[in-house]
Structures are given as C-alpha cells and as structure tokens.
Amino acid sequence: MRTSQYLFSTLKETPNDAQVVSHQLMLRAGMIRPMASGLYNWLPTGIKVLKKVENIIREEMNKGGAIEVLMPVVQPAELWQESGRWNDYGAELLRFVDRGSRDFVLGPTHEEVITDLVRREVSSYKQLPLNLYQTQTKFRDEVRPRFGVMRSREFVMKDAYSFHVDKASLQETYDVMYQVYSNIFTRLGLDFRAVQADTGSIGGSASHEFQVLASSGEDDVVFSTESDFAANIELAEAVAVGERQAPTAEMQLVDTPNAKTINELVEQFNLPIEKTVKTLIVKGATEEQSLVALVLRGDHELNEIKAQKHPLVADPLEFADEAEIKAKIGAGVGSLGVINLNVPAIIDRSVAVMSDFGCGANIDGKHYFNVNWERDVAMPEVADLRNVVEGDPSPDGKGVLQIKRGIEVGHIFQLGTKYSEAMKATVQGEDGKPLVMTMGCYGIGVTRVVAAAIEQHHDERGIIWPSDEIAPFTVAIVPMNMHKSESVQQFSEELYRTLKAQGVDVIFDDRKERPGVMFADMELIGVPHMVVIGEKNLANGEIEYKNRRTGEKQMIAKDQLLAFLKENVKA
C-alpha cells in the first residue's frame, strides 16, 4: 500500500478527552474516530488490525473443532421473554419496536438466538456435541461509555456456544476451548492469565476469565508466583496465615470515646492494626435472622461476592443502616464487636487465628482489648470472607500471591441447562426420551483485544504491536527525499513490488514529507520492521533497518536485504 493512495490519518496531538493510552494512540494512529458516545468509525489502519485479530481467532477456533455461523444483530423480544432475560437484563438491553409494532432488541449477546437455532436444527443426541461460533457486532447501552473501544456501546465479539448430552461432554469441550483461548492470546503476543471467575449475568456454573495484565485494567487479577493458580480477586480463596497463639494478657474494657474507626483506634492506642477486628452488619437471608455480623481483621477488606454467597447473608449483599444497628445491638457502628453480640456472627479465617485482639464492646465509646477466643468469647462460624492481599499463601500451597490490574478480553462459561431448559431445547436421547441439552459459551471481545494489546505494548513514540501477525503493516519502506533522488526512487519502487509479490504486507511511504515526519508516523502506527533508504547509504551498497519492537538499528548489504527480511519478517 502506498501512503499517497491510503487514508493515512495520523494526529500529532493527543485529543483531550482520551483518558487511557490505547484510546489516545488509536486516535493518533488514525485507527478510529468517534461518531457518538461509545460509537466509533474504524479507519483503514484500525480495520486492518481488527481483521488480523479476527483471522487469528478464526484459525484457532477452527483448529479446536468449532464451526462458524452468523446470526442477526436484531433479535425478536419473544426469545428474551422465553429465556426470562427480557425483564432481568436491565437498561443495557436496547429495545425497540418495528413498524409492525413488534418488540425487538439489539443483541448484547446471542444465547437466546443460538439456542433457538439449535433446537430447530438438531433433533438427536447423535448430532452432539456441537460447537458453533460467530464474529458479530454487539450493542450494550452502557450508562457511561469510556476508554475508547475498551468500554464502548457497540463492539465486535467472537461468541461461541456448545451443546452436549451431559456435563461430562461439556467439560471436554470446555477444556478444549480453554486451550484454544490460551493459544489465541499466546499467538497474539499478550501477557495474560486465565483466572477463575464469577459467572455474572450470563449464569451457569464454572467460569474462567482471560485477563491481559495492564496497569489501566479495571479488574484485580490474583496469581501465584510459583504455579498456574490465577483467579479474579472476587473468587480468590484467602488462606489464614499462622496458628492461634495462647493468651498473654487479661481482657480489658477500655474507654474509647474518640475512636469510631479502626484507624482512630490504632492511632490513639498505639495498636498494631493486625491486632484489631472490625464488625460489619449486613442484612440476613431470613426474617428470623434479619441482621448478620461479618467480622474481619482490621486491615482486611470484605469480599462482597464471597459474603453474599453465604447462606445466612441476603443476596444481593446489603449493609444495615445506622438506625437498624442501633435498635438491634444497642451501639453505633464504631463500637461493634463479637462480645455479647445478639445477632449471628461469621468470622473470617484470619480472625479465627487471632489472639489478644481488640474489638468494639457493643457499648458506645468502649472497646475490649486482649480478647481471646474460647477464653473470653465462643468461636462463631468461620468462613472465607475477605479479599486476598499480596503475599498471602497461594491456595494451592505453591508460592505466594501477586495482584495486578487486568483487562478482561475473554470469558468462558459452563452454562449447564439455564437456557436450554427455559427454551425447551431438547433432543431425542439414547433411550428415546427428550433430553435437555447442556450448554457452554465462550466469548472474546475482539475490539477490546486490540485496545488491550496497545495498553500492554507501547512507548512514548506510539504503538508496539506484540506480534507481527496483528500489525497493520509488517514492513514500512521509508525513502529519504525520494522525489529528489532517482536512485532512491528506483530502488524503493523495485523493493515495494518485490515485497508485494512475496505476500508481505508492506506500506510504502511515497509522500513528499520530511523524513522525521515519516519515521514518526511509522513508529506511531507500530510497523514492526522499517527499511530506510537513503541516497548516501544506497551508493555504499547499504540499507538501514530499524526494528520497532527492540529499537535495534543495523545496516544491511543491499543485495542481502531480501534474504534478511525473509528471515526476520513474518509475512
């Protein structure tokens, strides 16, 4: 491609409304342009990258035995009403009425459509397992679209859905898809972790997220220093450290009128924060136990996902207000504790191994110090309630935990029969009776993958694509003052024709621009291999080569250039 015949729309300045690096660089590199809130036009440079990512995903999905289909973006409301999600999905579901007064939605996902398709096309257990996928536009009416294509309203997604006779068959396909996803993100050159995750609004049982590690990520990713263990922070199991020690002092009731928070207690009484506990009051799951106490070490944070999964706790989690707490317990939130507590208590594992600790006395303005389990108060129920912290032991017993920010680019679920049961998607089983199909689903945010790659791989000059396979062009020919030098023009034209004939995705910068502008643009869009042709070097039989990823520069003999590029460039 010649730049003179290309829509090459780079920007020198960073737009003010672009907050994250990927948004800034995608705008500056001429990959995208905003049209409305959360809606983007993809320009030629952007669409080249997007299609290359799609092709890698398609190739690996096909290798894994999945079969490509294409389903409509517009979906009839009846399918969503049948699945039960018409009322449950919320405001992100864009609904509209056609001129025949029929309700439709703009699809945020395709579980209903694929289930309807398969129940019409598949009738026997002999046709299973079946794994169908598509790459299609989705729309979610985000309340606050932000970060460019990282969280836009319209986006491209690869979504796959598998159908099975039983859970064992689903597990086999799930394992295959786990490996397929690992292969995809490895081939894309991304530093990622596959983490245990919550199933969220999609539903189902087992679930893994594929997270690209990047400081701009919205999720906390927990992983071991010495094993493959990785989990979303909401699901990472917290292991108690150490064993409970014998008491060393008598319990004391202390006046603490000005200590209404853990930090104030620690500062005023010179207590180690890890020797304090805090008591949080939440709504209970039943009328008989309308309030429940959750007890954590003073320096630990409550994991709300873990808490609301406890049978005594209301789901969704809801904290009791000050008036409810005062009426039931007789003390304000700054003086709550485990002694003489008149509501059920659940203590975190880390609290269960504490000794000589401080806690509220359930009397306003008072705390107990040197409290010990069994001696001073009976041990309540113990559960995993907290978020893990860096340095915690890994739950698999191998290494310690690290926590980094991550961008979710893929998610796989074992749906079970959530949709097939609701929509009566059955086949004739081996015994001749109707059998409800078991389902899995597997999604990759294709547009988000592009942004995540940039978040993880860039420098002050622009994008550094982690793999030649997804760069918009693999080789840039940059002729210096070509329009003033016949030899430079002749060599550049010949090299361009040769590389094109060899199938190399090459961009030839034939603009009448200063060399500095040409270099800056090629580095900005992230072309991994740059061939710089100058009159003086050419006269000496040499060509300059620059590697965008390593920053390496070297002189290559003119007659060895094609062999060098063939060895170093993945066409």
Curated annotation (Swiss-Prot):
InterPro entries recorded: aa-tRNA-synt_IIb (IPR002314), aa-tRNA-synth_II (IPR006195), aa-tRNA-synth_II/BPL/LPL (IPR045864), Anticodon-bd (IPR004154), Anticodon-bd_dom_sf (IPR036621), Pro-tRNA-ligase_IIa (IPR002316), Pro-tRNA-synth_IIa_bac-type (IPR004500), Pro-tRNA-Synthase_IIa_type1 (IPR023717)
Keyword Flavoprotein assigned: no
Record's keyword terms, sorted: Aminoacyl-tRNA synthetase, ATP-binding, Cytoplasm, Ligase, Nucleotide-binding, Protein biosynthesis
Top enzyme class: ligase
Cited Gene3D superfamilies: Anticodon-binding domain (3.40.50.800), Bira Bifunctional Protein, Domain 2 (3.30.930.10)
Reactions this protein catalyses: tRNA(Pro) + L-proline + ATP = L-prolyl-tRNA(Pro) + AMP + diphosphate
Record carries keyword DNA damage: no
A GO term, aspect molecular function: proline-tRNA ligase activity
UniProt subunit comment: Homodimer.
Function: Catalyzes the attachment of proline to tRNA(Pro) in a two-step reaction: proline is first activated by ATP to form Pro-AMP and then transferred to the acceptor end of tRNA(Pro). As ProRS can inadvertently accommodate and process non-cognate amino acids such as alanine and cysteine, to avoid such errors it has two additional distinct editing activities against alanine. One activity is designated as 'pretransfer' editing and involves the tRNA(Pro)-independent hydrolysis of activated Ala-AMP.
Family annotation (HAMAP family): Pro_tRNA_synth_type1
PANTHER family per UniProt: MITOCHONDRIAL RIBOSOME PROTEIN L39/PROLYL-TRNA LIGASE FAMILY MEMBER (PTHR42753), PROLINE--TRNA LIGASE (PTHR42753:SF2)
Name recorded for this polypeptide: Proline--tRNA ligase
Organism: Actinobacillus pleuropneumoniae serotype 3 (strain JL03)
Organism phylogeny: Bacteria, Pseudomonadati, Pseudomonadota, Gammaproteobacteria, Pasteurellales
Name of encoding gene: proS
